[in-house]
C-alpha cells in the first residue's frame, strides 16, 4: 500500500482507509491521532523511487528465521547459486542483516567495493548472472561493529531499496536479520509499497527451541500479510564425509519442522543435511556446487530451487 507511513505499525490499514487511526493495529502508532482526523502524514516521497527500482524485479523472496545460527544466510547464498545455475536467469541477493552481514564472505567477494554512478549503487558481481549488495561493502574495516539504532538501520534498508541499480532481475533473495525486529517491519512495509511480494522462506533446525521462534515468524508473516512459500529444515541430519552415512544430529522431541508444518498447514520444502564441506566452501568464498557437485546437499539445494520456482510460476 502506498499510503502506509514509514513509521507506521505492522498491519497499518493505510491512511486513506476507513479504519485509519481506528483499527486495532493503530494502537500506539505515532500517526494514530492524525489519521483518525483525516490529517494523516504526507506521503513518503521515496515510495515512487522504490517502486521504479522494483518494477524490473520479477520475484522478491524474503529469507527469514526466528533464531540466529540456523543457517539462514547459508541457505540464501546457496539457493541463489542454485537459481543462478540457469544462465538465462538473473539472480540477486540483498543482505539487510545490518549488524551481521555475512554474504560477501560466503560469496567470495569480501574485498570488493560498491561503485556509485548517476543510476545509483551498482551491486557487486559474483558471476555474470548473480549480484550482491550488502552493507559490508560500505564499511571501511570488516571487523568494525555496526552499532546503530533502529531508525538508522531502517534508513539504510530504505536506501538499499531505492538506490541500488539492480537492472532486470528474475529472482531477488533478501537475507534478513533473525527474529521479528523493527527492521523487518520497515522492510516489509517498503516492499509492499513497491508492489506484490512473492513470499517468505522460513528457516529452522529440528529442535523445539528453534521451532518456538519459527512459530513467531509465522505469526509475523500472517500479521504483515506476507505469503509463506514454505519452511526449510536445515541441519536435519549429518552426512559422514567418509562413508556418506546419515545420522540425526538434533533431537526432534516434538516432531521437528515436519510436525510443525503439518499443524500449521505449511509446506516443508526441504530437509537439508549438514555437510562439513559446505562450511569449508563458505569460509573460503567458494562455490559449493563446483567443489562438491555430486554431494547430497548440493542435490538438495537444486531440488529446493526447483520447488521455489514452481511456487512462483
From Swiss-Prot:
One BP term from GO: regulation of non-motile cilium assembly
Pfam families: ParA (PF10609)
Keyword annotations of the record: 4Fe-4S, ATP-binding, Cell projection, Cilium, Cilium biogenesis/degradation, Cytoplasm, Iron, Iron-sulfur, Metal-binding, Nucleotide-binding
Region annotation Disordered: where it falls in the sequence: 1-25
Amino-acid positions noted as binding ATP in the UniProt annotation, renumbered to this chain: 66-73
Subcellular compartments: Cytoplasm; Cell projection
Annotated InterPro entries: AAA+_ATPase, Mrp-like_CS, Mrp/NBP35_ATP-bd, NUBP1/Nbp35, P-loop_NTPase, YlxH/NBP35
Keyword Nucleotide-binding recorded: yes
Main location, first listed in the record: cytoplasm
Alphabetized CDD domains for the sequence: Mrp_NBP35 (cd02037)
Record's cofactor remark: Binds 4 [4Fe-4S] clusters per heterotetramer. Contains two stable clusters in the N-termini of NUBP1 and two labile, bridging clusters between subunits of the NUBP1-NUBP2 heterotetramer.
Keyword set includes Cell division: no
UniProt GO molecular function: 4 iron, 4 sulfur cluster binding; ATP binding; ATP hydrolysis activity; ATP-dependent FeS chaperone activity; iron-sulfur cluster binding; metal ion binding
Binding-site positions, [4Fe-4S] cluster 2: 240, 243
Cofactor(s) needed for function: [4Fe-4S] cluster
UniProt: [4Fe-4S] cluster 1 binding residues: 12, 26, 29, 35
Cellular component terms per the entry's GO annotation: cilium; cytosol
Protein family per UniProt: Belongs to the Mrp/NBP35 ATP-binding proteins family. NUBP1/NBP35 subfamily.
Function: Component of the cytosolic iron-sulfur (Fe/S) protein assembly (CIA) machinery. Required for maturation of extramitochondrial Fe-S proteins. The NUBP1-NUBP2 heterotetramer forms a Fe-S scaffold complex, mediating the de novo assembly of an Fe-S cluster and its transfer to target apoproteins. Regulates cilium formation and structure.
The protein, known as: Cytosolic Fe-S cluster assembly factor NUBP1 homolog
Organism: Caenorhabditis briggsae
Gene: nubp-1
Amino acid at each position: 500500500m502506498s499510503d502506509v507511513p514509514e513509521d507506521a505499525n505492522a498491519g497499518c490499514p493505510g491512511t486513506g482507509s476507513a479504519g485509519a487511526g481506528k483499527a486495532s493495529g493503530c494502537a500506539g502508532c505515532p500517526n494514530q491521532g492524525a489519521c483518525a482526523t483525516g490529517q494523516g502524514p504526507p506521503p513518503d516521497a521515496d515510495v515512487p523511487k522504490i517502486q521504479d527500482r522494483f518494477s524490473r524485479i520479477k520475484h522478491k523472496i524474503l529469507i527469514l528465521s526466528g533464531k540466529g545460527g540456523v543457517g539462514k544466510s547459508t541457505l540464501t547464498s546457496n539457493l541463489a547459486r542454485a537459481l543462478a545455475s540457469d544462465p538465462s536467469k538473473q539472480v540477486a541477493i540483498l543482505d539487510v542483516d545490518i549488524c551481521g552481514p555475512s554474504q560477501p564472505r560466503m560469496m567470495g567477494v569480501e574485498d570488493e567495493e560498491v561503485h556509485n554512478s548517476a543510476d545509483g549503487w551498482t551491486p557487486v558481481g559474483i558471476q555474470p548472472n548473480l549480484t550482491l549488495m550488502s552493507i559490508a561493502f560500505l564499511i571501511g574495516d570488516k571487523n568494525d561493529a555496526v552499532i546503530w539504532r533502529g531508525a538508522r538501520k531502517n534508513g539504510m534498508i530504505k536506501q538499499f531499496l531505492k538506490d541500488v541499480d539492480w537492472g532486470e532481475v528474475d529472482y531477488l533473495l533478501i537475507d534478513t536479520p533473525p527474529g521479528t525486529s523493527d527492521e523487518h517491519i520497515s522492510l516489509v512495509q517498503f516492499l509492499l509499497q513497491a508492489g506484490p511480494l512473492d513470499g517468505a522462506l522460513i528457516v529452522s533446525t529440528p529442535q523445539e527451541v528453534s521451532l518456538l521462534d519459527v512459530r513467531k515468524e509465522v505469526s509475523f508473516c500472517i500479521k504483515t500479510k506476507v505469503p509463506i512459500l514454505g519452511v526449510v529444515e536445515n541441519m536435519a541430519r549429518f552426512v559422514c564425509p567418509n562413508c556418506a552415512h546419515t545420522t540425526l544430529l538434533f533431537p526432534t522431541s516434538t516432531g521437528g519442522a515436519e510436525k510443525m508444518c503439518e499443524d500449521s498447514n505449511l509446506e516443508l520444502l526441504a530437509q537439508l543435511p549438514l555437510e562439513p564441506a559446505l562450511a569449508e566452501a563458505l569460509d573460503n568464498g567458494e562455490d559449493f556446487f563446483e567443489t562438491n557437485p555430486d554431494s547430497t546437499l548440493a542435490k538438495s539445494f537444486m531440488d529446493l530451487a526447483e520447488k521455489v520456482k514452481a511456487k512462483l510460476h
